[in-house]
Amino acid sequence: HGCKGDDFCDGDKDAIGRIAEYEASVGVTAIAPATMTLPVEELEQILHTAAEYKKETKDCRKADFLGINMEGPFISPAKKGAQDARNILPCNVEICDRFLKASEGLVKFIGIAPEESEHAAEFIREVHERVNVSLAHTNADYDTAMEACRAGANHAVHLYNAMPAFTHRAPGVVGAVFDNKDVMAEIICDGIHIHPSVVRATFQMMGA
């Protein structure tokens, strides 16, 4: 989302540049910043600004800007975390395409909570060849998450956080990810969001 006092959703090219320069200074060579759940029109402007930054910036001192990870607005109010519930929407193909257009194809991941729409599988089938679909900020149970994966969801963020806990009787989204080898998972390895033991176990199960 950001660092050093700058946020990707500031919608400011200079802020993106400072983020990219800081990341490069600590060894991160490429970034795909995440958005917050904001009004659609505001997100479109942020995405447009990012596309302009990408076209204008050729600086080896900055991390390469690979794309954008949209954590919202198609998420669950029950797992919204720091997101503003007033801006949460059910997944919508037209709005998704607006995001892709505004970003000039820079949006690489779009997060959804599949339990929040009876048309989630249809949405995934419609868009998954244009953008990677993530299970994100979701309260889905195992069966709902499995249906989303079968429809074409191929990514989960951030595994264990902002989703149901993994238990032996209710494996939830985490269990569905473990059961789908084509699904890539992102995890927050700061030792706070997830216990280091769980990070190690996840790498043992899923690999790098």
What kind of region is each of these model predictions?
Residues D12-A15, I46-T49, N92-E94, R169-V174:
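Charged helix-capping and loop-helix junction motifs
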Residues T144-A208:
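Active-site-adjacent C-terminal substructures of enzyme catalytic domains
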Residues V40-Q45, E115-A120, V133-N139, E186-Q204:
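Active-site glycine- and acidic-residue-rich loops that bind
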Residues H1-K13:
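Di-metal (Zn2+ and/or Mg2+/Mn2+) metal-binding site signature of metallo-dependent hydrolases
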Residues M70, P77-G172:
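Divalent metal-binding pocket/active-site signature
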Residues K55-K62, S103-G105, H128-R130, M206-G207:
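Short helix-capping segments at alpha-helix termini
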Residues K4, G17-I46, K62-S76, S103-E115, ...:
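Divalent metal-dependent hydrolysis catalytic cores, especially in the metallo-beta-lactamase
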Residues E41-E52, G81:
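Metal-dependent catalytic neighborhoods of phosphoester/phosphodiester hydrolases
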